[in-house]
Amino acid sequence: MALVPKIRNRTISDKPVSSSCTRTSSFRQRLLASCKRFLRFKLLVRASSVSLKKKAARCSQSQQVVKHNDDRIEEHSSSNRGFKDGNNFLVSSTETKKLVAFCGEPFQPLNEEEVALVNSALSKRNRKKILVSHKNSNIDISGETLQCLRPNQWLNDDVTNLYLELLKERQTRDPQKYFKCHFFNTFFYVKLVSGSGYNYKAVSRWTTKRKLGYDLIDCDIIFVPIHIDIHWTLGVINNRERKFVYLDSLFTGVGHTILNAMAKYLVDEVKQKSQKNIDVSSWGMEYVEERPQQQNGYDCGMFMLKYIDFYSRGLSLQFSQKDMPYFRLRTAKEILRLRAD
């Protein structure tokens, strides 16, 4: 019986490899490697583009908020600002370096020594103690008075008025850096409109040149803190831009009355102090709608102070409700140091 050779089926791998197939396979491998390199390059370019866009956006924002000083940066990150357990501020050395790199003056983080200073001042053992005394205003701040800067508290007159005095002194220290401003205290508007209504005579002696050292009309901006029932708002006489401005972190619907009172006051003030008649009929009356607004029932006073702080710097109002814990802590530090930064 003859043996028949067994023939098995060939698979692709059994095919003889020709030189042309080898060249084709090698070409495909090189092409695939090139494609992979191209895709990696494309992803790298895309990531770089996104990063550049983010940086450009931050730069653009900084340029918008800086009006008075072109080299001042207004970008900030508020994710690490706030109170912990009621009064401890979250700042690590690494986070501080990052914040300093991106933050401008209005958002300068506190160091450990400053945080300890505030925590000690707010402690129960210092409630009855006079912590600081301001000679020019005769305002004493006790531990009890300072408690209003804890979270969820309404600001009081002493803390508000002392902070305004510190802003005035800050401006005097560096007049080239800030607008020339006048900061009325919290009792001015109450006197101006108390009793039967508007009464210029009640405040006419508040602004003599002998007391101020300057004429009120020569100021760029005049700030008028306003307390209505349990709510703080702000009136602004802007001599630079010839307009009267009203800012309310809530909407109380009384802006028109306040704007008219400020306009009438300016006319009477100029007439009495310089014997001149000023026509404000062409001045603007502005209720600021695009403004930071509070999201609770107790931060109105802090919003008012920050409106003043930012405007006196020549900055637009680039802050929000989430910054309030930080601003409360910073204000406490500045009052304890008797120096606004």
Curated annotation (Swiss-Prot):
EC assignment: 3.4.22.-
Broad EC category: hydrolase
Top-level taxonomic group: Eukaryota
Pfam families in the record: Peptidase_C48 (PF02902)
Active-site residues annotated for this sequence: H231, D248, C300
PROSITE patterns: ULP_PROTEASE
Biological role: Protease that catalyzes two essential functions in the SUMO pathway: processing of full-length SUMOs to their mature forms and deconjugation of SUMO from targeted proteins.
Family to which the UniProt record says this protein belongs: Belongs to the peptidase C48 family.
Name of this protein: Putative ubiquitin-like-specific protease 1B
Taxon lineage: Eukaryota, Viridiplantae, Streptophyta, Embryophyta, Tracheophyta
